[in-house]
């Protein structure tokens, strides 16, 4: 099915993902079928979620999970537009429901992954198996899925999923240290600078990681109000804070400038490659929304450009253009070529210009 004798990694990955996705429709589409067109997202979202898990387990060298980081970031960018639509349009006509299929793939999959992380993998799997067993060779709606997941975990899954599935856009979670081990979390709708969007409220499964005095703790919570304060038990003080550990959540996040610098400084030791990628992607989103200045973004870009992980470096290259417009506004484009040479020469010299024997497919 692939042209030539040496297909590219991206072509191989695309073929495997599509094949696994279509096989997953045996369960989500054939074995259990949507009741009406407004739940078309159930078929496509679940098939993509399960298909990616299959592809990652069978072909770990193709970097399926790493490639999804970029896909989720791109759908977040689209979801920030005023024209964004909800994944599920209740009682929609077939023509209207079909318009949401595009966002259903990546946003829907990211939301399901967030809920899976919140519930725990075992509880989530029990809920999905319950859903499939109850509606085998029959029809089901979104409410049936939410009820099955809620039974498996005794959590407010229905209201949480509705807040992401039945309204457009995505939240921005602002994390502010208050001194000692206390922080404040506030949510609002994320939007790019100068764009007016309707206010929305979400029920957000948030996973935090923080470090202080040589100790590291994680805390999971549901942010179901505009703002809340909490203490990170196990720490006396906070040296650094990661507002989206995993990254597990479908949300943008913001730290004060000083705390963002502290997080970037400890990223090589305390953040996974996926979390470092998210740190960069999130910074680009903050640049677009006006929540991060050009200097702060350039400093972060320079730090992450020395990252050893190929997926993170690929993210750096993808986001080099995001800074050109802010620099042009400030009349600083003349220094851009030198920044590129200084930033990209070390990783280029380390990686080389040609594949090395035994090098992974992703590299």
Where is each model-derived feature located?
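Short beta-alpha connecting loops at secondary-structure transitions
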Residues: 3-7, 34, 94-101, 132-133, ...
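Flexible loop/turn segments at secondary-structure boundaries
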Residues: 2-3, 33-37, 49, 94-96, ...
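Conserved catalytic core of Hanks-type protein kinase domains
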Residues: 49, 118, 164
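Zinc-dependent metallopeptidase catalytic helix centered on the HExxH motif
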Residues: 3-69, 128-129
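Non-catalytic accessory/interaction domains
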Residues: 24, 62, 77, 87-90, ...
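Short, histidine-centered active-site or binding-site loop motifs used for metal coordination
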Residues: 1, 30-32, 91-93, 109, ...
């Amino acid at each position: 099915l692939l042209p030539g004798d040496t297909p590219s990694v991206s072509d191989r990955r695309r073929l495997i993902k599509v094949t696994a996705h279509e096989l997953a429709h045996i369960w989500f589409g054939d074995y259990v079928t949507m009741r009406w067109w407004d739940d078309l997202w159930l078929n496509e979202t679940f098939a993509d979620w399960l298909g990616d898990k299959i592809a990652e387990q069978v072909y770990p060298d193709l970097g399926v999970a790493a490639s999804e980081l970029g896909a989720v970031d791109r759908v977040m960018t689209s979801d920030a537009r005023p024209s964004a639509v909800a994944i599920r349009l209740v009682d929609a006509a077939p023509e209207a429901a079909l318009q949401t299929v595009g966002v259903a793939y990546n946003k829907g999959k990211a939301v399901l992954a967030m809920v899976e992380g919140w519930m725990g993998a075992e509880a989530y799997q029990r809920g999905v198996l319950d859903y499939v067993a109850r509606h085998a060779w029959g029809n089901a709606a979104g409410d049936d899925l939410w009820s099955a997941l809620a039974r498996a975990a005794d959590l407010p899954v229905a209201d949480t999923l509705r807040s992401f599935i039945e309204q457009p856009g995505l939240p921005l979670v602002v994390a502010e240290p208050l001194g000692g081990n206390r922080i404040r979390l506030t949510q609002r709708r994320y939007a790019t600078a100068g764009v007016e969007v309707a206010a929305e409220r979400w029920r957000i499964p948030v996973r935090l990681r923080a470090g202080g005095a040589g100790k590291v703790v994680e805390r999971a919570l549901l942010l179901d109000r505009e703002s809340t304060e909490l203490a990170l038990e196990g720490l006396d003080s906070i040296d650094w804070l990661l507002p989206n550990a995993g990254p597990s959540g479908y949300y943008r996040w913001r730290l004060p400038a000083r705390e963002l610098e502290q997080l970037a400084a400890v990223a090589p030791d305390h953040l996974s490659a996926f979390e470092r990628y998210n740190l960069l992607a999130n910074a680009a989103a903050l640049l677009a929304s006006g929540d991060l200045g050009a200097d702060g973004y350039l400093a972060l870009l320079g730090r992450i450009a020395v990252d050893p992980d190929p997926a993170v470096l690929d993210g750096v290259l993808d986001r080099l253009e995001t800074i050109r417009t802010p620099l042009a506004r400030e009349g600083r484009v003349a220094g851009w070529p030198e920044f590129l040479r200084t930033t990209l020469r070390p990783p280029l010299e380390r990686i080389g210009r040609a594949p090395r024997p035994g090098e992974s497919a992703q590299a």
